[in-house]
């Protein structure tokens, strides 16, 4: 590029009539004359450079030519990058066709991938590695299929340490992870918790395939609706798919209580909507709320429903905010409105408030949901591990320093309310006669075992924990949410299996 530029400048210089002889300068003035006289240039009798009336025009012409060449090269470089990114997409699509045409007798575990030349992309993080089975290496279902085991209960099984196929992604490389669940980023050196795979008894979970899932979501919207544990699952899902989407073709957008992840390549959206009590409440602000002082509006859900009712897939959850934080804690329920002058405030048991919320949600779904379009899921209770004495530990440490799952089969914590899920199944069952099925994601039992998988003190909640807070795990260790990669990835494997195969 540079040799062509200099040749062009030389040609312009020649056309201007300026000759290329050497310039001869007089000796500089003596020391005593410094500052009194300017050095003057003299030339041979053939030299006319400094006196040429075309000198200014020559310089301007040269500068214009320089900028034209640089702009042209930059434009060609940008187009070349776009073309290579588009080529990556086309190669991936072609590879998917080839994989679909692969004979059924192909060997189990055979992998084919298309790796894009990374040197042509805008940044190292924009590397595109379209590998259709990258995350599926060590599971038992050879082609990511369902195995035909439609009666299999995935929720019954055991955790198997798997250093080959787990984790499904790197938390340090997921650009959309939240700091409150990024445990290895905030100092957790033990990463064993990332390598456990859930193995159901007598069957296998379909392998998660990010590109197939994104294809399923093409021109569709998946929305998670609920509390911070549901946001935990949403972040997990985004991390499970975002690695397979090049930079510039994905985006996270904040809009009040709604956070959207957009995959432009597929025109797919994966949303999280903050609605911890499902109904309208005084806790609807995702930042400003008080867990201990809660009021729900028993007859108001439309403000929330207008956000999620047209989605293709909806995953609700609501459990954490219905647990008692202390003895005697009640839920305040408001009927009517102050505007209409008929406001009435009651206090009910927490579980009764939960029933009020689910019945109102069910009533709305039955009257407004498009059963031919929208599939509905409800995530089971996510157990906390705040009382180490439940498994023989020290309550002062909560779940800090736990590195192994609980090995007691069918272990159930005394603090997990299984009756709430039974109530949810009963209430959602009233939609069946209307042709609306709410699929329960039975995640509770498998999560009960994982006392080792919480952020504890290895997190950031708006600001990093202080040394004093880190030294006081009985107050500041988070044993409710889940490190990522981790347990919520399995919840999403359940969701994937239902969406793709059932």
From Swiss-Prot:
It holds the Pfam family PC-Esterase. Residues 77-502 are lumenal. GO terms for cellular component: Golgi apparatus; Golgi membrane. Disruption phenotype: Stunted growth and reduced plant height. The double mutants tbl1 and tbl2 exhibit increased susceptibility to the bacterial pathogen Xanthomonas oryzae pv oryzae (Xoo). It is a single-pass type II membrane protein. Glycans are attached at residues 153, 163, 189, 209, 255, 267, 372, 401, 442. GO terms for biological process: defense response; xylan acetylation. Residues 1-53 are cytoplasmic. Signal peptide: none annotated. GO terms for molecular function: O-acetyltransferase activity; xylan O-acetyltransferase activity. Disulfide bonds join 152-203, 174-239, 183-483, 399-479. It is an enzyme of class 2 (transferase). A motif (DXXH motif) lies at residues 478-481. The active site is at residues 228, 478, 481. A motif (GDS motif) lies at residues 226-228. The chain crosses the membrane at residues 54-76. It is found in: Golgi apparatus membrane. Keywords: Disulfide bond, Glycoprotein, Golgi apparatus, Membrane, Plant defense, Signal-anchor, Transferase, Transmembrane, Transmembrane helix. Belongs to the PC-esterase family. TBL subfamily. Xylan acetyltransferase required for 2-O- and 3-O-monoacetylation of xylosyl residues in xylan. Catalyzes the 2-O-acetylation of xylan, followed by nonenzymatic acetyl migration to the O-3 position, resulting in products that are monoacetylated at both O-2 and O-3 positions. This is Xylan O-acetyltransferase 13. It comes from Oryza sativa subsp. japonica.
């Amino acid at each position: 590029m540079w040799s062509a530029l200099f040749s062009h400048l030389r040609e312009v210089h020649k056309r201007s009539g300026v000759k290329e002889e050497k310039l001869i300068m007089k000796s500089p003035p003596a020391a005593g004359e410094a500052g009194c006289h300017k050095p003057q240039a003299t030339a041979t009798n053939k030299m006319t450079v400094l006196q040429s009336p075309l000198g200014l025009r020559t310089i301007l012409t040269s500068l214009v030519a320089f900028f034209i060449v640089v702009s042209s090269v930059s434009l060609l470089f940008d187009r070349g990058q776009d073309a290579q990114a588009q080529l990556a997409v086309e190669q991936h699509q072609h590879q998917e066709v080839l994989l679909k045409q692969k004979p059924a007798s192909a060997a189990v575990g055979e992998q084919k991938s298309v790796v894009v030349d990374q040197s042509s992309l805008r940044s190292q993080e924009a590397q595109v590695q379209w590998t259709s089975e990258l995350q599926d290496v060590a599971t038992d279902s050879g082609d990511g299929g369902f195995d035909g085991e439609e009666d299999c209960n995935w929720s019954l099984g055991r955790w198997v340490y798997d250093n080959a196929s787990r984790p499904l992604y790197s938390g340090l490389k997921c650009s959309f992870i939240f700091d409150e669940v990024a445990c290895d980023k905030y100092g957790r050196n033990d990463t064993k918790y990332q390598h456990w795979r859930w193995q159901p008894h007598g069957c296998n979970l379909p392998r998660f395939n990010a590109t197939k899932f994104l294809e399923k979501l093409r021109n569709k919207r998946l929305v998670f609706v609920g509390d911070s544990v549901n946001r935990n699952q949403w972040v997990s899902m985004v991390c499970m798919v975002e690695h397979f989407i090049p930079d510039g073709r994905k985006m996270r957008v904040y809009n009040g209580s709604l956070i959207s992840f957009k995959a432009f390549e597929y025109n797919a959206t994966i949303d999280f909507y903050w609605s911890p009590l499902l109904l309208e409440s005084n806790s609807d602000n995702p930042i400003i709320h008080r867990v201990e002082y809660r009021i729900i509006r028993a007859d108001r859900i439309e403000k929330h429903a207008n956000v999620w009712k047209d989605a293709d897939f909806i995953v609700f959850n609501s459990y954490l905010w219905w647990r008692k934080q202390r003895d005697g804690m009640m839920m305040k329920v408001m009927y009517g409105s102050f505007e209409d002058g008929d406001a009435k405030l009651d206090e009910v048991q927490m579980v009764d408030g939960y029933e009020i919320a689910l019945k109102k949600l069910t009533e709305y779904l039955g009257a407004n949901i498009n059963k031919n379009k929208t599939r509905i899921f409800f995530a089971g209770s996510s157990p906390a591990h705040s009382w180490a004495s439940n498994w023989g530990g020290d309550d002062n440490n909560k779940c800090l320093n736990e590195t192994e799952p609980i090995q007691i089969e069918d272990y159930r914590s005394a603090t997990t309310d299984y009756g709430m899920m039974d109530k949810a199944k009963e209430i959602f069952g009233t939609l069946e006669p209307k042709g609306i099925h709410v699929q329960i994601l039975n995640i509770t039992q498998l999560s009960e075992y994982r006392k080792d998988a919480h952020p504890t003190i290895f997190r950031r909640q708006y600001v990093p924990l202080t040394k004093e807070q880190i030294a006081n795990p009985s107050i500041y260790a988070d044993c409710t949410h889940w490190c990522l990669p981790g347990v919520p990835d399995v919840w999403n494997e359940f969701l994937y299996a239902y969406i793709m195969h059932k």
